[in-house]
């Protein structure tokens, strides 16, 4: 349902942000 879609979207955004942080800290 909608909640699942929201959860999936939030997860994707969170992963993207974590990857950006990782790139800043350790390089890509």
UniProtKB/Swiss-Prot annotation:
Which keywords does this chain's UniProt record carry? Amphibian defense peptide, Antibiotic, Antimicrobial, Disulfide bond, Inflammatory response, Mast cell degranulation, Secreted
Q: Which InterPro entries match?
A: Antimicrobial_frog_2
Q: Which GO terms describe its cellular component?
A: extracellular region
**Role, per record:** Mast cell degranulating peptide. Causes histamine release from rat peritoneal mast cells in vitro. Has antibacterial activity against the Gram-negative bacterium E.coli K12 and Gram-positive bacterium M.luteus NCT C2665.
* Protein name, as recorded: Ranatuerin-2SEc
Tell me yes or no: is Secreted among this UniProt entry's keywords: yes
Q: Which family does it belong to?
A: Belongs to the frog skin active peptide (FSAP) family. Ranatuerin subfamily.
Q: In which tissues is it expressed?
A: Expressed by the skin glands.
Disulfide links within the chain: 23-28
Annotated localization: Secreted
* Single biological process term from Gene Ontology: defense response to Gram-positive bacterium
Q: Which species is this record about? A: Lithobates sevosus (Dusky gopher frog)
């Amino acid at each position: 349902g909608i909640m699942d879609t929201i959860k999936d979207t939030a997860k994707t955004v969170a992963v993207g942000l974590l990857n950006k942080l990782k790139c800043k800290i350790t390089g890509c």
